Regions:
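Short aromatic-glycine motifs in intrinsically disordered, low-complexity regions
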Residues: 34-40, 75-79, 230
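A cross-family glycoside hydrolase active-site/sugar-binding cleft signature
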Residues: 71, 149, 172-174, 207-209, ...
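Extracellular "leader-to-stem" segments immediately downstream of a signal peptide or signal-anchor
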Residues: 2-67, 272-311
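Structural detector of coil-to-beta-strand junctions
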Residues: 101, 123-125, 147, 170-172, ...
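Extracellular beta-strand-rich solenoid/capping regions of secreted or surface-exposed proteins
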Residues: 57-65, 72-89, 95-114, 118-130, ...
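N-terminal post-signal-peptidase region of extra-cytosolic proteins
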Residues: 53, 70-73, 143
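Right-handed parallel beta-helix
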Residues: 85-93, 108-119, 130-144, 154-175, ...
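Extracellular beta-rich repeat passengers
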Residues: 208-311
Length: 311
């Protein structure tokens, strides 16, 4: 699965560069973004190439399905508010969004691939019950708040083959302990994180509230303060990952959140790391979708080789 997925991006880029409008039909997400109809982005729509904010913003904020090919560095003065049924894909190794990240609210069926996003308030933010979103092969760093935050009833998301670096609070999944947020988020926030490289980021990989099941598999955690935090009766399965020099691989109680979460860990590899906290049982993701694990012994090699842009 890992080799096919990693190669798929290169094949997709090749198709874009040669045909201008093609889509690799077998290049689909694994995990929560694949269920309940799946996530296809702008498939079936026109392909538009953009290289500045003046072209990107109206295209991303338009109604029709579109495949947006981002070339070079695009400077944004504010977050890009992407409408439903869009694919944003960077062309080559240097497609970059700077200054304003990507904001998804009350939208669905979005694919974000092969983009470097940095120096924004949030690199990517999902809220307002956004659903069916796939973030794949991106490089996210150096933002003011979060790199990839998912909250306010958002659901059915896959985060795969990304590199996160030069940041503190990385991936928030559920933003508040309050009762009204509990009612909003319970039954939602189902996210799969796989084959991501958390490269020296400090916390929140992710920090989870209320969601179940959240699936964290085959990721490489390196030089982090903590890995995964399951809080507020969330249920998280952490399997087949590598934790290297991570003080606290997992938490089930953290910060000022009053209630613990549930976390099951299995088949993880711990290198110069602390002891994981575990608690309770979690709904199995296999009841919702199929996935294939890479061997934990291979993760520290294949993830840095395959995660991030132009991989």
């Amino acid at each position: 699965m890992s080799r096919k997925t990693s190669r798929g991006l290169g094949g997709l880029l090749f198709l874009f560069l040669t045909a201008g409008h093609a889509w690799a039909a077998d290049d689909l997400p694994v995990g929560w973004a694949s269920v309940a109809g799946g996530t296809t982005g702008g498939q079936g729509g026109a392909t538009v190439t953009v290289s500045d904010a003046a072209a990107l913003e109206p295209a991303a904020e338009s109604t029709p399905p579109l495949i947006l090919r981002v070339v070079g560095t695009v400077h944004l003065a504010s977050p890009l508010r992407v409408k439903s049924n869009k694919t944003l894909i960077g062309v080559g190794p240097d497609a970059t969004i700077v200054g304003g990240g990507i904001f998804l609210t009350k939208v669905s069926n979005i694919i974000i691939r092969n983009l470097t996003i940095r120096e924004a308030p949030d690199a990517i933010n999902l809220e307002g019950a956004a659903h069916h979103v796939w973030v794949d092969h991106c490089d996210l760093s150096k933002c003011t708040d979060g790199l990839l935050d998912i909250k306010r009833g958002s659901d059915l998301v896959t985060v795969s083959w990304n590199r996160f670096h030069d940041h503190h609070k990385t991936c928030l999944l559920g933003h508040s302990d309050k009762d009204d947020i509990r009612r909003m988020d319970t039954g939602h926030l189902r996210v799969t994180y796989h084959h991501n490289f958390f490269d020296g980021t400090q916390t929140r990989h992710p920090r989870v509230r209320f969601a179940e099941p959240v699936h964290v598999f085959n990721n490489y955690f390196k030089n982090n303060e903590y890995g995964v935090a399951a809080l507020m009766d969330s249920g998280v399965l952490v399997e087949g990952n590598v934790f290297e020099n991570v003080e606290h691989p997992t938490h089930t109680q953290y910060g000022d959140s009053p209630d613990p979460g549930r976390l099951v860990e299995r088949d993880n590899l711990y290198i110069k790391s602390g002891t994981p906290e575990v608690r309770g049982s979690v709904v199995e993701p296999r009841t919702a979708y199929h996935y294939t694990l890479d061997r934990p012994a291979d993760v520290a090699r294949i993830v840095p080789q395959g995660a991030g842009v132009a991989r």
